[in-house]
Amino acid sequence: MNAEKSPVNHNVDHEEIAKFEAVASRWWDLEGEFKPLHRINPLRLSYIAERAGGLFGKKVLDVGCGGGILAESMAREGATVTGLDMGFEPLQVAKLHALESGIQVDYVQETVEEHAAKHAGQYDVVTCMEMLEHVPDPQSVVRACAQLVKPGGDVFFSTLNRNGKSWLMAVVGAEYILRMVPKGTHDVKKFIKPAELLGWVDQTSLKERHITGLHYNPITNTFKLGPGVDVNYMLHTQNK
């Protein structure tokens, strides 16, 4: 388990990295800024594991892993997991938590494009959760994910749709009213319509397999997966 540094390439938003660096120490605080990620992680994990036909014994890459919430949970399922992130502090938190938990995860500080140049076609599963809306060129990330997965392997994306409802729910509601995430976490201009993401996927070797929405009910304070991709959504693709 290590956290290696590497040269920064063009597809990095330093302001976005700084946001997460500032709160990295609270990544594993179940009642802190990352509480929503902890709450939705079981849903993400079950969706990924089910759609990929299980994770045990598979080589998995988590792109934009942050403090390692999803990466650790996939490792617990028996996967060999590598976590990528450009934030040094989140990776240090992830490394320490994995050590404390007795979980083996290889954490690397580099962009997915850099990783793809060295590890093309090496992964059974690639996950990229809530990361595309935080980089200058999300299409480049999609291309790199396609390069990294083996033939027949699975790639999963999750992001936010760009429309009035997603602005109300993810920005006004989540940041200012419910205060579920820190103010300034999201920029609606960077949200990605499903048609845009699918268009980028179509320009790679990936093929769409399934898409689902991730929904929050403020009355019951619960999350669920289901039809409707007007706010948060997850996309399962497979390498042809």
From Swiss-Prot:
Q: What class of enzyme is it?
A: transferase
* Molecular function (Gene Ontology), one example: polyprenyldihydroxybenzoate methyltransferase activity
The metabolic or biological pathway listed in the UniProt record of this protein is: Cofactor biosynthesis; ubiquinone biosynthesis
Q: Which is one Pfam family of this protein?
A: Methyltransf_23
Gene3D superfamilies, sorted? Vaccinia Virus protein VP39
Keyword Transmembrane recorded = no
GO BP annotations, alphabetical order: methylation
Q: Where along the chain is S-adenosyl-L-methionine bound? A: R44, G64, D85, M129
The protein's annotated catalytic reaction(s) are: a 3-demethylubiquinol + S-adenosyl-L-methionine = a ubiquinol + S-adenosyl-L-homocysteine + H(+); a 3-(all-trans-polyprenyl)benzene-1,2-diol + S-adenosyl-L-methionine = a 2-methoxy-6-(all-trans-polyprenyl)phenol + S-adenosyl-L-homocysteine + H(+)
- Record key words, sorted: Methyltransferase, S-adenosyl-L-methionine, Transferase, Ubiquinone biosynthesis
Q: What is its EC number?
A: 2.1.1.222, 2.1.1.64
Disulphide-bonded residues: none
Family as reported in the entry's similarity comment: Belongs to the methyltransferase superfamily. UbiG/COQ3 family.
Its biological purpose: O-methyltransferase that catalyzes the 2 O-methylation steps in the ubiquinone biosynthetic pathway.
Q: What is this protein called?
A: Ubiquinone biosynthesis O-methyltransferase
Originating organism: Escherichia coli O157:H7
Phylogenetic lineage: Bacteria, Pseudomonadati, Pseudomonadota, Gammaproteobacteria, Enterobacterales
Q: Gene behind this chain?
A: ubiG
